[in-house]
C-alpha cells in the first residue's frame, strides 16, 4: 500500500460518508521497541524518550522485543527499569490507567560481551564482568527489575487481546505450548506472539535463529501476529512485514540500523563478497544513530502499524494497515506488496556527474576510484531505498557494478538526503571500449524507476 492509498483508506476509516461521524477509537494501542542495547544511563535516555512518546500516544501496553542490555549487565536492566518508573510510575498513566509491560529477553541480555570487542568496550567504560546478568541470577534480576516471574512462556491479556512471549533461552518452546494451549485462544480476533528472533523464511534476511519453530507453531493460524527484533533491519524496508499462514512484523531497533546483504556502503559484515571496501560504511553499530519504533493500533477491521523515527522526532514511513480478518486479504504477502508499491523516480532534469579520483579505501590504501554524484530520487513521499549503478558498454551488454543504499534509507521523510554519492574501484570498469554509467533508483523490493546516464566515457 503506497501513501496515497493509505491516506484515502485512513480517511474512510476515520469518518463515515454520512455526516463525517468519527470512527470509534482503537480497541488496543501498543508501543513497540526492540534492541535498545542499553549500556549506560546516557543510552537509556533513548528508551525513555520512546516511552514518553508512547505515554503521550495513550498506549495500553509497551512491548520490548529483547536485547534490553548491550553487554548483558545488571546495571542496564536497572537503567531500563528506572526509565520506565519515571515515565509510568507504578505502571500507570498520569490519569491512573494501568500500562502493561510486554517485555522479553534477547541474546545480548545473556551473552552480550561475547560479540566483537564488546568485553573491551565494557571494561573501557568502567563496567565489570562481576555484574553479568547470567552470573547474578538472571531470573531473579528479571523479577527484581520488571516485577514478574521469569517463566519459559508468558501469556498476558490486554484489553481482551492475548500476548504470548518466550525468553531467549526458551525460544524453542512456543510450538509445544501452542499444541497444548492454542485452543484456548480466541480465533475470532488477532493474538500476538513476540520473541527476539524472527520466524524463518518470513521477514528474515540471513539472520534469524528461530530454526522454524514459529512456522511450526503458527502456520495456518491467520489471526496470529508474530513480532520479532534482532536483525536491526529498517522499517522503511517493506520486507519487514510478511503475510502467509500468519502475519510477521519486524520491530527494527532502538539503537542502530543494519542493511540487508549486498550493498557497497554496508559495514563489511553485510557488504558484497567481491567488494573492496571503497565506500565508507553508513552508520551502524559503532555510530548508533537512527532509532526506530512503532505504535500498533488494533481496530475491529484492521491493525495499523505507525512507524516512528525517534532520532529525528518524526514519522518514519507510510504506516502498514493490515485488514482483519487477515485470512481474507494478504496485502503484505511479498508479491502483492511489491506490486502495489510505487517505484521511485529522479526529479526532472536530474544528471549524474562521473569522475575518477585517486582516493583511499576503508583501509586507508591508495585507490583509483570512480565517483558518481547524483540527486536523490524523491517525489513527494515516494523515495528510493537504494540505487543500482550499471556499466553500459556501447556494444549493448550491461553489467551491474554496484548497489548502494540511500544514505538516509532509515530516516523519516522529513530528513531525506538531497544528494547521493557512489564510489567504486575503476577495476570494475571495462577497458578499451566506450561505455556509459546508468543509475537506477529502486524501491526496497528492487523495482527500479527510469535511470539517469553519464556521458560516454572510455577507460584506457
Can you describe what each PLM-predicted range is?
Residues 4-22:
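N-terminal export signals
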Residues 21-78:
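N-terminal active-site segment of His-dependent metallophosphoesterases
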Residues 32-34, 62-67, 100-107, 192-196, ...:
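Active-site neighborhood of phospho(di)ester-bond hydrolases with catalytic His/Asp-centered motifs
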Residues 74-180, 185-187, 213, 217-222, ...:
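Extended active-site neighborhood of metal-dependent phosphoesterases/phosphodiesterases
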Residues 186-203:
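Short acidic, glycine-rich surface-loop motifs adjacent to enzyme active sites
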Residues 274-403, 451-452, 457-458:
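A short C-terminal boundary segment appended to hydrolase-like catalytic domains
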Residues 386-430:
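Recognizes extended acidic, P/S/T-rich segments that occur
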Residues 429-446:
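Beta-strand-rich modules
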Amino acid at each position: 500500500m503506497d501513501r496515497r492509498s493509505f491516506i484515502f483508506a485512513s480517511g474512510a476509516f476515520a469518518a463515515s460518508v454520512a455526516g463525517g461521524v468519527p470512527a470509534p477509537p482503537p480497541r488496543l494501542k501498543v508501543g513497540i521497541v526492540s534492541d535498545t542495547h542499553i549500556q549506560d544511563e546516557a543510552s537509556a535516555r533513548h528508551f525513555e524518550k520512546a516511552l514518553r512518546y508512547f505515554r503521550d500516544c495513550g498506549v495500553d501496553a509497551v512491548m520490548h522485543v529483547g536485547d534490553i542490555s548491550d553487554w548483558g549487565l545488571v546495571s542496564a536492566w536497572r537503567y531500563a527499569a528506572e526509565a520506565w518508573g519515571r515515565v509510568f510510575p507504578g505502571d500507570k498513566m498520569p490519569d491512573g490507567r494501568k500500562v502493561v509491560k510486554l517485555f522479553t529477553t534477547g541474546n545480548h541480555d545473556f551473552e552480550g560481551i561475547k560479540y566483537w570487542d564488546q568485553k573491551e568496550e565494557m571494561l573501557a567504560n568502567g563496567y565489570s564482568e562481576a555484574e553479568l546478568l547470567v552470573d547474578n541470577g538472571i531470573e531473579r534480576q528479571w523479577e527484581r527489575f520488571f516485577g514478574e516471574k521469569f517463566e519459559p512462556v508468558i501469556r498476558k491479556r490486554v484489553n481482551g487481546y492475548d500476548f504470548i512471549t518466550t525468553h531467549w533461552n526458551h525460544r524453542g518452546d512456543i510450538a509445544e505450548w501452542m499444541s497444548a494451549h492454542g485452543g484456548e485462544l480466541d480465533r475470532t480476533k488477532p493474538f500476538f506472539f513476540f520473541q527476539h528472533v524472527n520466524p524463518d523464511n518470513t521477514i528474515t534476511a540471513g539472520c534469524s535463529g528461530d530454526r522454524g519453530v514459529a512456522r511450526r507453531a503458527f502456520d495456518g493460524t491467520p489471526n496470529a501476529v508474530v513480532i520479532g527484533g534482532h536483525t536491526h533491519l529498517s522499517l522503511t524496508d517493506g520486507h519487514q512485514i510478511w503475510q502467509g499462514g500468519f502475519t510477521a512484523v519486524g520491530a527494527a531497533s532502538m539503537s542502530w540500523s543494519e542493511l540487508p546483504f549486498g550493498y557497497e556502503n554496508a559495514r563489511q559484515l553485510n557488504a558484497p563478497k567481491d567488494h573492496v571496501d571503497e565506500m565508507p560504511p553508513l552508520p551502524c553499530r559503532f555510530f548508533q544513530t537512527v532509532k526506530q519504533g512503532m505504535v500498533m493500533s488494533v481496530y475491529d477491521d484492521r491493525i495499523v502499524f505507525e512507524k516512528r523515527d525517534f532520532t529525528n522526532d518524526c514519522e518514519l514511513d507510510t504506516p502498514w494497515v493490515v485488514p482483519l480478518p487477515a485470512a481474507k486479504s494478504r496485502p503484505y504477502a511479498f508479491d502483492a506488496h511489491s506490486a502495489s508499491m510505487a517505484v521511485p523516480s529522479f526529479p526532472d532534469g536530474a544528471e549524474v556527474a562521473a569522475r575518477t579520483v585517486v582516493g583511499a579505501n576503508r583501509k586507508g590504501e591508495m585507490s583509483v576510484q570512480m565517483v558518481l554524484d547524483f540527486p536523490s530520487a524523491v517525489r513527494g513521499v515516494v523515495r528510493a531505498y537504494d540505487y543500482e549503478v550499471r556499466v553500459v558498454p556501447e556494444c549493448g551488454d550491461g553489467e551491474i557494478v554496484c548497489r548502494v543504499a540511500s544514505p538516509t534509507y532509515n530516516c523519516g521523510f522529513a530528513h531525506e538526503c538531497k544528494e547521493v554519492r557512489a564510489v567504486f574501484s575503476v577495476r570494475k570498469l571495462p577497458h578499451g571500449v566506450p561505455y556509459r554509467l546508468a543509475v537506477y533508483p529502486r524501491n526496497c523490493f528492487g523495482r527500479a524507476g527510469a535511470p539517469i546516464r553519464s556521458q560516454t566515457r572510455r577507460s584506457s
